[in-house]
Amino acid sequence: KVADSMTPDAEILEVDKKAGYMKTADAQYDLSLGDQAAVELWDKYIEAHNNQDLETIMAMESETITILGPDGVVTKGKEAHSKFLEEWFKAANPKWSNYFSVPVKVNWDEQPGTWVTNGHNLTLTVDGVESTTGNIADVYIEDGLVQMFYVFSRELPAPESADSE
């Protein structure tokens, strides 16, 4: 933020500070810091997942949500996502632990929303055995709804037990 003059009644102006770029096939667009409200929405969305609250999750995403999972699976639409989550919650009891989130604005008219890049660990419990992955999610939020996200994943080693020392 900067002032338009050095007077006591100066107007404060919002200024986008360049923070990288995004390339498409046809152009390159500047990035700047995005709206913190998008990070807060994503945190609430993850909290709803940890609580396995399908009603809240569905209220926070667009009808046409697209999810590109780390295993190459593409899920399109709320109904398909709800069905997927219902089964996954029962089978693996997933739990997320966020460790960073950054909102980014693409200065491009075709994307008026905010991207959130989020780092988190995801712990699954299948047949009593826990496994954890480190993940990065790129999330697009527009009009107060999660529109799409990509997840990139890395397997983390199992913690060493006290017996192995």
Give residue spans per PLM region:
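Short beta-strand segments enriched in hydrophobic/aromatic residues
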Residues: 61, 120-124, 137, 153
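Hydrophobic pocket/interface hotspot
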Residues: 45, 56-58, 65, 77, ...
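Short, solvent-exposed mixed-charge patches
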Residues: 162-165
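Sec/Tat-exported extracytoplasmic proteins
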Residues: 46-53, 61-65, 85-93, 126
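Surface-exposed, charged secondary-structure patches
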Residues: 84-127
